Amino acid sequence: MAAGFKTVEPLEYYRRFLKENCRPDGRELGEFRTTTVNIGSISTADGSALVKLGNTTVICGVKAEFAAPSTDAPDKGYVVPNVDLPPLCSSRFRSGPPGEEAQVASQFIADVIENSQIIQKEDLCISPGKLVWVLYCDLICLDYDGNILDACTFALLAALKNVQLPEVTINEETALAEVNLKKKSYLNIRTHPVATSFAVFDDTLLIVDPTGEEEHLATGTLTIVMDEEGKLCCLHKPETGTSFSFF
Amino acid sequence: MEEETHTDAKIRAENGTGSSPRGPGCSLRHFACEQNLLSRPDGSASFLQGDTSVLAGVYGPAEVKVSKEIFNKATLEVILRPKIGLPGVAEKSRERLIRNTCEAVVLGTLHPRTSITVVLQVVSDAGSLLACCLNAACMALVDAGVPMRALFCGVACALDSDGTLVLDPTSKQEKEARAVLTFALDSVERKLLMSSTKGLYSDTELQQCLAAAQAASQHVFRFYRESLQRRYSKS
């Protein structure tokens, strides 16, 4: 009978739980889902991480390649994130070019990397003006159950911490790069940004780490990214059925 | 009856304290708005903030594709075209922000199974682009006669390295700033509809910026009111 009620009136069903300050999956309003992280699972990538936030699963693989730096920033490398939401993770996505949600998530991750200065781009320089590293970070969602932005940020951070770059020297005679695969070093991760997403219900209730259903029923969502010093890197409040005041 | 209904409503908002350099605090750049300048869209508006200019056109409520129709409300679509080049991922992200702001105020339930399309063209970018796009979109929606529960405005502010707040930054100020925050506020209770930030800042600074943006939004809403009064008055 509860299942019938849930299908017919999902919002009312949800409100019954919220009145008791809990959610259908048994969590409190401020409780996160069980988080699991698996580092270094992809051996062909330079760094990888798999993050599970409840059912939401995101895997991040980082590949490092050579590139020529741009002329206005000759000592800066590149970090290129890309979030892919394939039809595998949810029935709402179709195959083909990236949809709006994937593009927005990619832009969000790019902003987090840029704002929080997680990696100093100068650390990725091998030879100024000639050769720099470019880190292609591919985030693929394997299971979409809400809160994709938090999972992606976490997976990216974990994968970047796992990246090992080989030592590269430029041979002066041949002007070619010589890669020493035996000598690898980790990246210098300067800050650890953490994203937290909230869903707003009926203008008054704020719940943390919304699942897919909760995101759909909520009147709005809000994502805040903070680093260890408590500085905010990003305040992303895109969706709102209505407004709410901050104070 | 296709007369020239070209009602210009060029109002100059009161300036802050004179010309550049602007002091810290609440002076917005000089702004101007022109409505009903395009003949094809149902509503159009051009909004200028200093040297930043955005042209907006609204089509709707109009026919919607069956795949995109929502049974109980209007489908809102926003298309943002940059000044140069093809639209990229950053434009998509901004489109999402503007769309969600519009969805919060437009009374979509009055026009179910229709589509309302807002098309924005960046004419020139000299800082505070997202805020200017929001203002242009709001004016265009008003010009098109789309029912809304409130007006909204965009306000941008920049925080430089020693914590000074500058409202409505120019592109030079944005580049040199430590953080740039853009807020969309509604006209009824000055509540926050959308926020998009870039850079590092603390939460007290966020509260300060939000308070300054709310104060500045008073000027913008007063400008909207005067602009529309001028347009619709008989004299």
UniProtKB/Swiss-Prot annotation, chain B:
SUPFAM superfamilies reported in the protein's UniProt record: Ribonuclease PH domain 2-like, Ribosomal protein S5 domain 2-like
Transit peptide in keyword set: no
Residues where Phosphoserine is found: S20
Coiled-coil portions: none
GO BP: defense response to virus; DNA deamination; mRNA catabolic process; nuclear mRNA surveillance; poly(A)-dependent snoRNA 3'-end processing; RNA catabolic process; RNA processing; rRNA catabolic process
Keyword field: Cytoplasm, Disease variant, DNA-binding, Exosome, Intellectual disability, Nucleus, Phosphoprotein, rRNA processing
An MF annotation (GO) of this entry: DNA binding
Region (Disordered): 1-24
The protein's name in its UniProt record: Exosome complex component RRP46
